Amino acid sequence: MQAMSIRIFLILFILILIYPSASPAATERRIALIIGNSAYSSGTLKNPVNDAAAMASQLQKLGFTVILKKNANLRGMEDALTDFGDRLKRGGVGLFFYAGHGLQVGGANYLVPIGARINRESDIRYETLDAGKILDEMANANNGLNIVILDACRDNPYSRSFRNAARGLAIVSNAPVGTFVSYSTSPGKRSP
């Protein structure tokens, strides 16, 4: 695992240890959706699929039920999110991990699936997964602890051509109570 992934895992491990319902008796209430997208037509990213697989393996050791998607298109990401939402249970722990391309437009974060065709700003809402949908699923479950880890702050290839695009990802301000959001870099910045 990369150094950043190890840091994320350590933070995650500490959160799970200190959260009361994360005891061994509550392991059936831990659900994680892990998505790693590497095989983009604009160029393959080296680490996302490997990081997703490593994170899934570690979470399974911590008693999570894991939904793992590698190189998912939009439909695959949406179906996985629906499955994740259906499995979340009140009082449990929900975790979402994404590694791949992400972008910020108009203050909202979007996760870029494999096969996305984004030629103009208006394509974003039809060709990407709005990160707000993940928070909506978590809010609907009313879990005591939600963890969102976004390793998606790479260069936004559209930031120069789209009026409302910005570098990096936006700060999440509408997360449900009890939600921990972690980025691979500071909001508004990009990672190498």
Placement of each model-derived feature along the sequence:
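N-terminal secretory signal peptides that target proteins for export/translocation
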Residues: M1-S5
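Bacterial N-terminal signal peptides
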Residues: I8-Y19
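Active-site-proximal C-terminal subdomain of hydrolase catalytic domains
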Residues: G36, G43, P48, A56-L59, ...
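N-terminal, post-signal-peptide region of Sec/Tat-exported proteins
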Residues: N47-K89
